[in-house]
């Protein structure tokens, strides 16, 4: 079988060029012949692009780069169209491969942008610790606070902080003193009076200290709200003094503590509440127990290679490259030509996509493999981890000295020993924390549990979330049950959590490419950007444009969901993101050739035997077939046609929600901004296919009955494998594994080996195939099995929160989940197997060289398909999903453009495509 690849066979459109000896200098021809044995040029100069051979760096070389300013702009709410006039002077050749659009504008990433995990404000505070606060109960003010500053005395003017040069008392400036960051510097001082601190009034709504921020209102850092005086001309701070003494005091009521109470502009810029008591009002004693959590990180940047920014489609918004003499447009795009995906796969074939290149915004979408597939090998916590008090002692008591009279009588020793000695008895006081287990548990919650499907999450009590589930506020407010994916779930196994298999793993804050692209723009919401965007359309991205005057125009989208990417995938339109283009210029390069060299090149390229031909790298008609929610079978019918030059099928599955309508410049139903597999190649639903059958309209089976399984049917995975047809400790069949190795790497029945590195890059099947297995309790043979549901399971009880990320509750008690699968008391178990294969597309090769897909006979193969047309029926069996999806099929065809520039200012393009000549698979 011929090796299928994304490039079609060149023999279908051979480009006839002159022999090198006809136009290269005699010296170069002689050099080539003399060195041919060890430096072979081959037919390098038979290509339509002829390299300059002399006079390259002389004073007659042209200037390298020119800037073209648009002659016309047309801006709407959804797009920005620019038109350029490209004037290519005599003896010059414009290199379209080097052109790029230079775009300047302003980007507002919206309030949902959060480029970090955790909080920037009081991140060391316990999640449930309140700010020092006051509240009113039965018309009396209650205070809960801290007084860290120790002054010299307290009067009705407040706390004394020092003395001036005249030895007069200086009292705290209540606009900013006492400062909350200043207190006692030694652990061994335990003052009982003259203490001062700050506290928030009951008119400032309570919230936890974790994540609290109040802007300063003076240059000393004070935060008290400014209030206007009666004359409304000046503003002052309204800070009150609250004096206290001990509750047991009955006689001397001089103050021992003063709290400076104030109202501040309290905010929580990057946190939200996950526990809120049910009380009326914004200040109450119960609200001291509120608990905060950080807002979820949401990186927002332009898509990889600026996917979605330029508009590629033929329905009314087509790009234009036309000679002004002829006005024939060289750009003929088709609705089924996927320019963006083609460019992604081409870059992968050319080099290593894991290397980022900032100029073209090249930073490919990725995910942390430890998040997609969890290797839960437990934690190494053999040694306990302790924390100790600052004094490094146990709990101390006060002791006085005693002495003996050299006998058995003891008496008080107050002559040379203090009467107040702090002595601890026993071991040093300590508290233990299992750091390793807590870090692992926190990793699982932040990286996996919070990304569970929404149906697995809950809304905390007394928290109101918006109805629109695509908003950041809704996604951010929902919480997962930590015990659903705790350290003991699937412990010892390498397994992806089943609910996560169908969740887009690229919509994650560990998408390193998106994080890089987001950080290229900075860490603020408002960004004045200046970007360079390359042309990707295959017919013009490598074109040599000969002298003449040309019209070049293109549309740029302004839809933030299409041109921006967020790690949460929220609806950026609703969440307040916007983009404004201020200028779009075109930068173009001329070949640095001497004029006589350029004129020779022009004369050659004007000849129709040297027309420039370009292949679309993907070379495929791509079709989307809807799969309704919970459907398991997808039939496809292709009308009768000649299948010459057909190379096979590639297919995968997409979510309808994640696939925009490319036919319109603005898709109102595209309420999503995560990765778009249809355009960027972030496929992740390949594991949901069960089998596919291929039937041509004949009685002859294809691809023959010499395979392991049924002719006409490719079985992808088997749940029950009685015959042993599965492979690699998973449920993929040997048949399908061999077909993938054959179609991707030409590694067929001659044995198994690793494909060459240049074929095994980011979108490779071999690199992304991930088999896995685990054991679970056999509920039929284990007679004592009880189906204990999540609310009734307990493990780490008393040390963790219950059914949510809130404060720990309960008591220490033996765990009742999970059942042991190891050791002396291991319960009966079953083995489950599955696989994941992201990024790649399943492929079925079809060799149009054979043209005989019949059964093998002693007469050789039946020439059934040689020159006749046949219809095709395909049926895909898939796993049901609870949302509408799309079957994405690439019919690998032959897609070439041949560009002819016979005269000045004339450009003609001929597009050849077979077997799908027009824009869809029905013609």
Curated annotation (Swiss-Prot):
<feature type="modified residue" description="Phosphotyrosine; by host">
    <location>
        <position position="911"/>
    </location>
</feature>
<dbReference type="InterPro" id="IPR044942">
    <property type="entry name" value="Adenovirus_Pll_hexon_sub2"/>
</dbReference>
<comment type="function">
    <text>Major capsid protein that self-associates to form 240 hexon trimers, each in the shape of a hexagon, building most of the pseudo T=25 capsid. Assembled into trimeric units with the help of the chaperone shutoff protein. Transported by pre-protein VI to the nucleus where it associates with other structural proteins to form an empty capsid. Might be involved, through its interaction with host dyneins, in the intracellular microtubule-dependent transport of incoming viral capsid to the nucleus.</text>
</comment>
<dbReference type="InterPro" id="IPR016110">
    <property type="entry name" value="Adenovirus_Pll_hexon_sub3"/>
</dbReference>
<dbReference type="GO" id="GO:0043657">
    <property type="term" value="C:host cell"/>
</dbReference>
<dbReference type="InterPro" id="IPR016112">
    <property type="entry name" value="VP_dsDNA_II"/>
</dbReference>
<keyword id="KW-1160">Virus entry into host cell</keyword>
<keyword id="KW-0945">Host-virus interaction</keyword>
<dbReference type="GO" id="GO:0042025">
    <property type="term" value="C:host cell nucleus"/>
</dbReference>
<protein>
    <recommendedName>
        <fullName>Hexon protein</fullName>
    </recommendedName>
</protein>
<comment type="similarity">
    <text>Belongs to the adenoviridae hexon protein family.</text>
</comment>
<keyword id="KW-0426">Late protein</keyword>
<keyword id="KW-0167">Capsid protein</keyword>
<feature type="modified residue" description="N-acetylalanine; by host">
    <location>
        <position position="2"/>
    </location>
</feature>
<keyword id="KW-1177">Microtubular inwards viral transport</keyword>
<keyword id="KW-1048">Host nucleus</keyword>
<dbReference type="InterPro" id="IPR016107">
    <property type="entry name" value="Adenovirus_Pll_hexon_N"/>
</dbReference>
<keyword id="KW-1148">T=25 icosahedral capsid protein</keyword>
<feature type="site" description="Involved in interaction with pre-protein VI">
    <location>
        <position position="748"/>
    </location>
</feature>
<keyword id="KW-1176">Cytoplasmic inwards viral transport</keyword>
<dbReference type="GO" id="GO:0046718">
    <property type="term" value="P:symbiont entry into host cell"/>
</dbReference>
<keyword id="KW-0597">Phosphoprotein</keyword>
<dbReference type="Pfam" id="PF01065">
    <property type="entry name" value="Adeno_hexon"/>
</dbReference>
<keyword id="KW-0007">Acetylation</keyword>
<dbReference type="InterPro" id="IPR037542">
    <property type="entry name" value="ADV_hexon"/>
</dbReference>
<dbReference type="GO" id="GO:0005198">
    <property type="term" value="F:structural molecule activity"/>
</dbReference>
<dbReference type="GO" id="GO:0039623">
    <property type="term" value="C:T=25 icosahedral viral capsid"/>
</dbReference>
<keyword id="KW-0946">Virion</keyword>
<dbReference type="Pfam" id="PF03678">
    <property type="entry name" value="Adeno_hexon_C"/>
</dbReference>
<dbReference type="InterPro" id="IPR016108">
    <property type="entry name" value="Adenovirus_Pll_hexon_C"/>
</dbReference>
<dbReference type="GO" id="GO:0075521">
    <property type="term" value="P:microtubule-dependent intracellular transport of viral material towards nucleus"/>
</dbReference>
<comment type="subunit">
    <text>Homotrimer. Interacts with the capsid vertex protein; this interaction binds the peripentonal hexons to the neighboring penton base. Interacts with the hexon-linking protein; this interaction tethers the hexons surrounding the penton to those situated in the central plate of the facet. Interacts with the hexon-interlacing protein; this interaction lashes the hexons together. Interacts with host dyneins DYNC1LI1 and DYNC1I2; this interaction might be involved in intracellular microtubule-dependent transport of incoming viral capsid.</text>
</comment>
């Amino acid at each position: 079988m011929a090796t299928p690849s994304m490039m079609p066979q060149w023999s279908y459109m051979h480009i006839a060029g002159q022999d090198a000896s006809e136009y290269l200098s005699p010296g170069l021809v002689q050099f080539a012949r003399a060195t041919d044995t060890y430096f072979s040029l081959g037919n390098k100069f038979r290509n339509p692009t002829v390299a300059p051979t002399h006079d390259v760096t002389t004073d007659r070389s042209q200037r390298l780069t020119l800037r073209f300013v648009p002659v016309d702009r047309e801006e709407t709410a959804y797009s920005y169209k620019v038109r350029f006039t490209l004037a290519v002077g005599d003896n010059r050749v414009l290199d379209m491969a080097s052109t790029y659009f230079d775009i300047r504008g302003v980007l507002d990433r919206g309030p949902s942008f959060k480029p970090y995990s955790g909080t920037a404000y009081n991140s060391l505070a316990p999640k449930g610790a309140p700010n020092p606060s006051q509240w009113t109960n039965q018309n009396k003010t209650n205070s809960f606070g801290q007084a860290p500053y120790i002054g010299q005395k307290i009067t009705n003017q407040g706390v004394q902080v020092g003395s001036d040069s005249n030895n007069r008392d200086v009292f705290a400036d209540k606009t900013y003193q006492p400062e909350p960051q200043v207190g006692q510097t030694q652990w061994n001082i335990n003052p009982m009076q003259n203490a001062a601190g700050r506290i928030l009034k009951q008119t400032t709504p309570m919230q936890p200290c974790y994540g609290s921020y109040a802007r300063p209102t003076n240059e000393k850092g004070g935060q008290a709200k400014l209030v206007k005086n009666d004359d409304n001309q000046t503003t002052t701070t309204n800070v009150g003094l609250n004096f206290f003494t001990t509750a047991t005091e009955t006689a001397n009521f001089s103050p021992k503590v003063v709290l400076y109470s104030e109202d501040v502009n309290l905010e929580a810029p990057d946190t939200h509440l996950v526990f809120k008591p049910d009380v009326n009002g914004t200040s109450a004693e119960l609200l001291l127990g509120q608990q905060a959590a950080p807002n979820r990180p949401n990186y927002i940047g332009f898509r990889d290679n600026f996917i979605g920014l330029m508009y590629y489609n033929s329905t009314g918004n087509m790009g234009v490259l036309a000679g002004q003499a002829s006005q024939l447009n060289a750009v003929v795009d088709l609705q089924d030509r996927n320019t963006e995906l083609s460019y992604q796969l081409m870059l992968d074939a050319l080099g290593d996509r894991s290397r980022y290149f900032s100029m073209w915004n090249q930073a490919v979408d990725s995910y942390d493999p430890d998040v997609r597939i969890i290797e839960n090998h437990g934690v190494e916590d053999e040694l306990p981890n302790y924390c100790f008090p600052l004094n490094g002692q146990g709990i101390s008591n006060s002791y006085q000295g005693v002495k003996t009279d050299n006998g058995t009588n003891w008496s008080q020793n107050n002559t040379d020993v203090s009467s107040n000695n702090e002595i601890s008895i026993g071991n040093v006081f300590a508290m233990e924390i299992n750091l390793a287990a807590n870090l692992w548990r926190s990793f699982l919650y932040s990286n996996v549990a919070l990304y569970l499907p929404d149906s697995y999450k809950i809304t905390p009590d007394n928290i109101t979330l918006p109805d629109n589930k695509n908003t950041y506020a809704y996604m951010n407010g929902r919480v997962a049950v930590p015990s659903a994916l705790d350290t003991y779930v699937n412990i010892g196994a390498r397994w992806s959590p089943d609910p996560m298999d169908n969740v887009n793993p690229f919509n994650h804050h560990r998408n390193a490419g998106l994080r890089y692209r987001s950080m290229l723009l900075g860490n603020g919401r408002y960004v004045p950007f200046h970007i360079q965007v390359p042309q990707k359309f295959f017919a013009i991205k490598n074109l040599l444009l000969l002298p003449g005057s040309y019209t070049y125009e293109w549309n740029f989208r302004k839809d933030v969901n299409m041109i921006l990417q967020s790690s949460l995938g929220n609806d950026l339109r609703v969440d307040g993101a916007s983009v404004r283009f201020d200028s779009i210029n075109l930068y173009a390069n001329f070949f640095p050739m001497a004029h006589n060299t350029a004129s020779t090149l022009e004369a050659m390229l004007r000849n129709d035997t040297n027309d420039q031909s370009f292949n679309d790298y993907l070379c495929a008609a791509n079709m989307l077939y809807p799969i309704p929610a919970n459907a398991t079978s997808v039939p496809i019918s292709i009308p009768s046609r000649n299948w010459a030059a057909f190379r096979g099928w590639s297919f995968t599955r997409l979510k309808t929600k994640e696939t925009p309508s490319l036919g319109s410049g603005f898709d109102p139903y595209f309420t999503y901004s995560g990765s778009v597999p249809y355009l960027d190649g972030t496929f992740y639903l390949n594991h949901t296919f069960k089998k596919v059958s291929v039937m041509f309209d004949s009685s002859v089976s294809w691809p023959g009955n010499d395979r392991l399984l049924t002719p006409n049917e490719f079985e992808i995975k088997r749940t029950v494998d009685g015959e042993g047809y599965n492979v690699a400790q998973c449920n993929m069949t040997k048949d399908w594994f061999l077909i993938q190795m054959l179609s991707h790497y030409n590694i067929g029945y001659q044995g198994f080996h690793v494909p060459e590195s240049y074929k095994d890059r980011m979108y490779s099947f071999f690199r992304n195939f991930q088999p896995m297995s685990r054991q679970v309790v056999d509920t039929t043979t284990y007679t004592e099995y009880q189906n204990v549901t999540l609310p009734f399971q307990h493990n780490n009880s008393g040390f963790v929160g219950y059914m949510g990320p809130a404060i720990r509750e309960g008591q220490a008690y033996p765990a009742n989940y999970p059942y042991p699968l190891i050791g002396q008391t291991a319960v009966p178990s079953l083995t489950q197997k599955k696989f994941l294969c992201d990024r790649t597309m399943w492929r079925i090769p079809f060799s149009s060289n054979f043209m005989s897909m019949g059964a093998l006979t002693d007469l050789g193969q039946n020439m059934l398909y040689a020159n006749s047309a046949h219809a095709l029926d395909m049926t895909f069996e898939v796993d049901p999903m609870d949302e509408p999806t799309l079957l994405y099929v690439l019919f690998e065809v032959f897609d070439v453009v041949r560009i002819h520039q016979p005269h000045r200012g004339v450009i003609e393009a001929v597009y050849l495509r077979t077997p799908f000549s027009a824009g869809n698979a029905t013609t």
